[in-house]
Amino acid sequence: MAMLFGFGQSAEIQIRLSNEDTRKIVKARGDDGNMHDHFLYYDGESVTGTVHVNLKKANHKFEHQGIRIEFIGQIEVYYDRGNQQDFISLTRELARPGDLTQNAQFPFEFNNVEKPFETYMGTNVKLRYFLRVTVIRRLTDLTKELDLVVHALSSYPDNDKSIKMEVGIEDCLHIEFEYNKNKYHLQDVIVGKIYFLLVRIKIKYMEIAILKTEVVGSGPNTFKESETVAKFEIMDGAPVRGESIPIRLFLAGYDLAPSMRDVGKKFSVKYFLNLVLVDEEDRRYFKQQEVTLWRKADKVMRRPGTEDDEEEKQTTSIPGTQKFTAPAPVEHPKPESPRSDPKSGSTSPDDNSDSS
C-alpha cells in the first residue's frame, strides 16, 4: 500500500513497510466516520520499512535541515483537542541537513515496539498509533503520517464463572436469570436463560441488549457516554410461572472493541448486558450486569523447545498475547544424562434510574 504526500511541486514522500505483501489489513473507523484499511500490528512486533523521497523535477536541488521518522502512540480527548498525550514516542534520524538532487531511500526500524493498548475510536476519545515522517525546512516542516492498527490480545481460562441472580418486584414479578460466563471474546456466543418464578403482571415482550459505556476523564471533568450496540428480542408474549426462556446472542456480527480499564489514566470502556421487560402499559423493567469483552488470539504462543512448540512449529504464533493461565512446567536436565531435552437487586419501572 503506497502512502503518498505531495511537497508542493518539489517532491513526494512514500512510506513502505517491510512486509506489506503478507501483513494483515483490517478496517478501522477514521475521523471522517468512514472505514479505512490499515496494516495490523500486535504488542512486541517490530515496525520496519523504508521512506522514499522522490523529487518531481530531475536534477532539482531539494534543501532540508534533516529528515526523521517517529513511531507514536497517542491518546486524544475530543473536548481537549490540542492536548494529546503521547504514551509512546520513538524517533529515528534518517538524514542530516543537506541537499537532495535525486530520489532517495531511507530504511528505518523500530525493534520489538511495546504497544500496550488497543487502537480505539470512540465517541469522546481516540487512541491511535502512527508513523510520522518530518522533513525539516527553513520555513515550514513537511510531514506525513501513516496510521497503524494495533489489536490487544488476551487469553482466559475456559472455566469462567457463570452469572446467576434472582430479581423481582414483591408480590408482582420474580425471575431468575443466568449467563454462562462473565467474560466473552469478540467472536463468542452469549448463552443463558430466564426462569419465571412469579408472574402477576402482563408482560408484552422481553429483550436483551449490549450497552457500551465510555468514561473519559475524572472528577468534575468526567464525561460518560452510553450507547446500545446490540439488541435482541428473546420473548414475545406473556410468560407463565415456571416458564424458561433461552438466550443465545452471537457477538461476531457486531462492531465491538475489548473492555478497557483506565487506559493511560484517561478513559475506560465497559460493557453491560441489559435485560429489559416491557408490560402492556409500556412500563419497562430492567436489570444490568457488567461483562468483560476481550480479543482472542488466533494462535496461542508456545514456549520454544517444549512439546507443544514441536506440535505447533509449522504454524505462526501471534505476538503480543497476554495470557492469564499458569506457566507450563519445564523439565529440568537429569544429572546422569550428557544431553537434556528442554522442554441481589430488584427491578422497578424505568424512571431514569437503573434497578440494580
Curated annotation (Swiss-Prot):
GO terms for cellular component: cytosol; endosome; retromer complex. The keyword Transport applies. InterPro entries: Arrestin-like_C, Vps26-related. GO terms for biological process: intracellular protein transport; retrograde transport, endosome to Golgi. Residues 315-324 have a biased composition (Polar residues). Residues 331-342 have a biased composition (Basic and acidic residues). Residues 301-356 are annotated as: Disordered. The keyword Protein transport applies. It comes from the Eukaryota. Keywords: Protein transport, Transport. Belongs to the VPS26 family. May play a role in vesicular protein sorting, similar to the yeast retromer proteins. This is Vacuolar protein sorting-associated protein 26.
